[in-house]
Amino acid sequence: SYPVGKIGLNQEMSPLIFSLIRILMMVIFLFPFLRFSSIKKANFKFVLVYGFLMGLGLYPLMYLSLAQTTSTSSMILVMQFSIPFGVIAGSIYLGENVSQKRWLLISLVLFGLAIICFDPIVLQSPYSLILGCLAAISYGLASMISRKLADFNALEVNGWMAITTLPIMTILAFLFQNQEFKIILPHSL
């Protein structure tokens, strides 16, 4: 999705509007898969947390990062921080057992990613690097939370994510991308 996102952002579309369109399409396509009885399940709160981390954390931050960077491939690498971060967060918050071998491998991954991120082309866009790291943290936390979602299928989780974040994303896009929002709105009616 990174190259497609970069192409979309290069076509004069703002990151928040791009995120809003992505979430809106998810609502349209995934609505038929929602089971409203799921709201009563004890773990539904984790669906909401997952949704906010993905819909309001990962997507907008990732697209803001892509809009600021000169190197899409470097942002793809930065997003790989999400994997070790998810394992670390799972160890801390969920009490998951992580072997010494896995800690060693996580350290090597973090060290390798840190070396790659000091490539001069990455450092040309420090704001993009920060946004990419925040997106990776959000994605890592969402990955950790997803372990609590065994009672739900993936289509349903993503559908709830889209429905719960659509109103907030719409407000954010309207507040921060007001001009573009006003241009798009009449064309969609």
Q: What positions do the PLM features span?
A:
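Loop-to-transmembrane alpha-helix entry segments
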Residues: 41-42, 46, 73-79, 95-115, ...
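Membrane-interface helix termini and inter-helical loops of multi-pass transporters
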Residues: 3-12, 66-68, 115-127, 175-189
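Glycine-/small-residue-enriched transmembrane alpha-helix faces in small-molecule transporters
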Residues: 1-17, 121-148, 167-171
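Hydrophobic alpha-helical transmembrane segments of multi-pass integral membrane proteins
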Residues: 16-32, 49, 105-108, 127-131, ...
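C-terminal transmembrane-helix exit sites in multi-pass transporters
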Residues: 29-38, 82-104, 120, 176
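Hydrophobic transmembrane alpha-helices of multi-pass small-molecule transport proteins
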Residues: 30, 50, 89, 101-118, ...
